UniProtKB/Swiss-Prot annotation:
Organism, scientific name: Campylobacter hominis (strain ATCC BAA-381 / DSM 21671 / CCUG 45161 / LMG 19568 / NCTC 13146 / CH001A)
Subunit structure and binding partners: Monomer.
Gene: ileS
Function: Catalyzes the attachment of isoleucine to tRNA(Ile). As IleRS can inadvertently accommodate and process structurally similar amino acids such as valine, to avoid such errors it has two additional distinct tRNA(Ile)-dependent editing activities. One activity is designated as 'pretransfer' editing and involves the hydrolysis of activated Val-AMP. The other activity is designated 'posttransfer' editing and involves deacylation of mischarged Val-tRNA(Ile).
GO CC entries: cytosol
Superkingdom assignment: Bacteria
This protein's name: Isoleucine--tRNA ligase
PANTHER family, sorted: ISOLEUCINE--TRNA LIGASE, MITOCHONDRIAL, SOLEUCYL-TRNA SYNTHETASE
Reactions performed catalytically: tRNA(Ile) + L-isoleucine + ATP = L-isoleucyl-tRNA(Ile) + AMP + diphosphate
UniProt KW Cell cycle keyword: no
Protein keywords: Aminoacyl-tRNA synthetase, ATP-binding, Cytoplasm, Ligase, Metal-binding, Nucleotide-binding, Protein biosynthesis, Zinc
Length: 921
């Protein structure tokens, strides 16, 4: 007879396979449209005592999303939901960065040769349309990932009011005296035709000249050190800067030597130069660097005088100890030359070519100068080396780390131009500088991981003044007027406020669309005819660094309060958004705009290599979603240690899919076995129920602590170990007999079901921040006893289980260790084909502690048919745990055709338990 229909087998409509790629889009669409889950999340927690807002670091509105975007937004979504499912009132307003060079370059490509004929207003209009197009594209792509946020009202930096707020912040900084305009060497992208901030520069290996050049000393300088025909030898990697040389800088504290070759070097570096073959090392004379100060050598390229000066920046870690100084091409060069009143010469134009300055300043000899006018500086290197002739002591090539424009990917140069800067070291607040205020503010910020604190602190300590001006079209203008006569900027409150109001109404385009008279307030004391406009625009990092003001302080967005609870971006943003936001906020508010910073690594392939189209190892999030599902991408983020680079590949995603399958099937088993339970019974928990509840309590709380500390990989490690080892590996397995075979309403069956419901209710909100789709699907198909009055995933709140640790008492240890040892022996017996199932066995033990418990429970624990005290001499195996003996004996009973336990007196006869359940004899 087939007894299958008499068993209480599991039943649920929650599918074994998620079919995520097919099903996710439908549920996501419902979240955004019919169910309005973000609005629901706000409404559900509006009376919560604790709030959390994550301020979104804006992605750039250009191009499609890549896997790095997916990592970033998923991690943000998980963290916001970690707070939400803990019962907190959360806010997340996504945003976009819209201004800047990449979009402008796209428009230049579209315009081709017509760019010069196109007005700034038209270019800006096209840039705005381009940004708008990609905001819509990226918004849909983010929503396709199931990211929850205020997608109906995101912040967009090119909105008129937003541009006005950026400008207002600039005005406040100007009025505090921190905005200065001066000519100074800055990173210059000749390919983009604009100045760059430090954050816009990336370093790559570049092959350059390594050249040692001898400058003849003047007669006076020779006489001063008692030499004849002495030569000061400098080392440089940029021969193209030699025409602009104005000085040779020595370290004020070092001793210098004259060698037998008549070369002057720092004594400290002589041995190194001997090894390089630059000198034989024989010292003729030693002297202090100060002896040459304010005397001259002669530039061998153009015979112009080069002044000997002293500077602390001259290090003894390479070169000759005599530093070629061109104040227009280096920051140290500029500052040290300033002290000596040396003129800054700039012979290079915006495009990186020599201009007419090389003629007027006689930077080349007359017979060759025409050849160099209009020549790109990098093409001039070889020709300059040739012209230097015998003055070249040594020349070669070497590879070194060199700054590149991160947008054009072309090498940049240092070039002195007139720019706007935010001063780092000018006192403004109680005598403190912006650098000091910012460093102070960082002390109040929490970092995840903590190493981020040292990184950004070091950067703030060592950074130069912030160059915020750009010579481009698409950005927020530095909308100030100058006095035509004096060229001084005018920071008049009435004018600045009027421009702010105009920008709010018409956008920053008004700066180019309106005449000066139209931009001035009525009855203004300044006359339009005496004024001129500043035509530079703001560094796009100033835009993003001002988002806290426009989003958190303006009242225009329901984004939470200033300061944000968290800023979260990739680790490169220590030098980018984290820093620009800190500086703008410190200048205006004297505080950081964030309470905490969390950083993540970059996505790399399985071998740890950077993703590159040329290498062919790029993984697009859209493809992952189509093949595996977004939920797998989310679990990949949850399982990964985001504090370092995250590896992703097809193989890794398959492994994550397997982990997801285990989680899903565990939940499915739990749901399927409680479908007939109407109310939880807590009075009759068995020892096994109490054991798994205590294990669940420990695992869930450790997981929750890790999640609340944003250590998701640790949390999932603990959780998955519990689900596979304790819950699925032991408890659910041993419960099958009482769930399927006991009477429907037996206390053992109901206590197991009650246990499973309690575990499920706690598990779902715990994993909901990461596996939101899955939990929402679970809630659709879960029986009412699991839902507990809740409608969907967004109604859930994590509440801990509270059960004591079962392993605290001695019996608990004995149970666990003996079971592990028992199943080790079972594996051997099965391999030896002595048994097929543990149900064929009787387990005998000398432990009175174990035998004092309910025997049915103990049988379930070891999954045997009988338990008894030691009595058999004929046994299959024997083992000891804690001085207690255990013997495995073949049962002399028959297999019950219903429950398969060896507890029937006769063949094909039901065991006593099954007879009772079916009411047969």
């Amino acid at each position: 007879m087939d007894y299958k229909d008499t068993l209480f087998l599991p039943t649920t409509d929650f599918a074994m396979r998620g079919n995520l790629p097919q099903n996710e889009p439908k549920r996501f669409k419902a979240w955004y449209n019919e169910r309005k889950v973000y609005e629901k999340m706000k409404a559900k927690r509006q009376s919560a005592g604790v709030s959390f807002n994550l301020h979104d670091g804006p992605p750039y509105a250009n191009g499609h999303l890549h896997i790095g975007h997916a990592l970033n937004k998923i991690l943000k979504d998980i963290i916001v939901k970690t707070h939400y499912f803990a019962g907190e009132n959360v806010r997340y307003v996504p945003g976009w960065d819209c201004h800047g060079l990449p979009i402008e370059q796209q428009i230049e490509i579209k315009l081709g040769g017509k760019k010069n004929e196109t007005s700034k207003t038209k270019i800006r209009e096209m840039c705005r349309a381009h940004a708008r197009e990609f905001i819509n594209i990226q918004r849909d792509e983010f929503k396709d990932m199931g990211i929850i946020g205020d997608w109906d009202d995101p912040y967009i930096t090119m909105k008129f009011k937003f541009e006005a707020e950026i400008y207002k912040g600039l005005c406040e900084i100007a009025k505090k005296g921190l905005l200065i305009e001066r000519s100074k060497p800055v990173f210059w992208s000749w390919a983009a035709g604009s100045a760059l901030a430090e954050a816009e520069v990336e370093y790559k290996d570049k092959e350059d000249y390594s050249i040692y050049i001898a400058f003849d000393l003047s007669d006076e300088a020779n006489k001063k050190i008692g030499a004849k025909g002495a030569k000061a030898v400098i080392w440089t990697t940029t021969p193209w800067t030699i025409p602009a040389n104005q000085a040779i800088c020595l370290n004020p504290d070092e001793i210098y030597v004259l060698t037998s070759e008549n070369f002057i070097f720092a004594k400290h570096l002589l041995e190194n130069l001997v090894q390089k073959g630059i000198s034989k090392g024989k010292i003729v004379k030693e002297f202090a660097s100060g002896e040459l100060e304010n005397l001259y050598a002669k530039n061998p390229l153009n015979d112009r005088p080069s002044k000997f000066i002293l500077g602390e920046h001259v290090l003894m870690d390479g070169g000759t100890g005599l530093v070629h100084t061109a104040p227009g091409h280096g920051e140290d060069d500029y500052y040290v030359s300033l002290k000596y009143g040396i003129e800054t010469i700039m012979p290079v134009d915006d495009a990186g070519k020599y201009d007419e300055t090389i003629k007027t300043k006689k930077l080349f000899r007359d017979n060759v100068v025409d050849e160099f006018v209009g020549m790109h500086i990098f093409k001039a290197n070889e020709k300059i080396v040739e012209l230097l002739g015998d003055a070249v002591v040594s020349v070669g090539k070497f590879t070194h780390s060199y700054p590149y424009c991160w947008r054009t990917h072309k090498p940049v140069i240092y070039r002195a131009t007139k720019q706007w800067f935010i001063a780092m070291d000018k006192p403004f607040k109680d005598g403190k500088t912006l650098r000091e205020v910012a460093l102070n503010a960082l002390k109040e910020v929490k970092f995840y991981p903590e190493v981020g604190r040292n990184r950004i602190t070091s950067m703030i300590e060592n950074r130069p003044d912030w160059c915020i001006s750009r010579q481009r079209d698409w950005g927020v203008p530095i909308a100030f007027f100058r006095d035509k006569a004096t060229k001084e900027p005018i920071f008049d409150d009435e004018i600045l406020n009027n421009i702010y109001e105009i920008f709010k109404e018409k956008g920053a385009d008004a700066w180019w669309e309106l005449d000066i008279g139209e931009l001035l307030p009525k009855n203004c004391k300044y006359e339009a005819k005496n004024l001129e406009k500043v035509v530079d625009i703001l560094d796009v990092w100033f835009d993003s660094g001002s988002t806290w003001r426009a989003v958190l302080k303006s009242g225009d967005y329901d984004a939470g309060e200033f300061r944000a609870d968290m800023y979260l971006e990739g680790s490169d943003q220590h030098r980018g958004w984290f820093q620009s936001s800190l500086l703008v906020s410190s200048a205006i508010n004297e505080t950081a705009p964030y309470k905490s910073i969390l950083t993540h690594g970059f996505t790399v392939d399985e071998k740890g290599q950077k993703m590159s189209k040329s290498v062919g190892n790029v993984i697009a999030p859209q493809e992952v979603a189509k093949k595996y599902g977004v939920e797998i991408m989310r679990l990949w983020v949850g399982l990964s240690d985001y504090s370092s680079d995250l590896k992703i590949s097809d193989n890794i995603l398959k492994q994550v899919s397997e982990q997801y399958r285990k989680i899903r099937n565990t939940i499915r088993f739990l749901l399927a076995n409680v479908s007939d339970l109407k109310e939880i019974e807590t009075n009759n928990f068995t020892m096994l129920d109490k054991w798994i509840l205590s294990k669940a309590n420990i695992a869930f709380e450790e997981t929750n602590r890790a999640f609340r500390n944003y250590d998701f990989s640790k949390g999932f490690s603990v959780l998955l170990n519990f689900l596979s080892a304790d819950l699925s590996g032991i408890y659910l397995d041993v419960c099958k007999d009482r769930l399927y075979c006991d009477e429907l309403d037996s206390s053992r069956r109901r206590s197991a079901q009650s246990t499973m419901v309690l575990i499920t209710r706690t598990l779902l909100p715990l994993i909901a921040p990461t596996l939101t789709y899955t939990v929402d699907e679970v809630m659709e198909f879960a029986p009412e006893i699991v839902k507990n009055g809740k409608k969907d995933a967004f109604d859930l709140v994590y509440e801990p289980l509270e059960f004591e640790d079962f392993k605290k008492n001695e019996t608990g240890e004995l149970f666990i260790e003996s079971r592990a040892k028992f199943f080790e022996i079972i594996d051997t017996l099965k391999k030896e084909k002595k048994i097929k199932s543990t149900l064929e066995l009787v387990l005998e033990t000398s432990s009175n502690e174990i035998l004092s418990h309910d025997l049915d429970e103990i049988c379930d624990w070891y999954m045997v048919s009988h338990m008894r005290s030691i009595e058999s001499r004929d046994f299959l195996a024997e083992f000891k745990v804690e001085d207690e003996t255990f013997r495995l004996v073949l049962s002399d009973h028959h297999k019950c055709p219903r429950c398969w336990k060896f507890d029937a007196k006769n063949e094909d006869e039901l065991c006593p338990r099954c007879q009772k359940v079916l009411n047969v004899k």
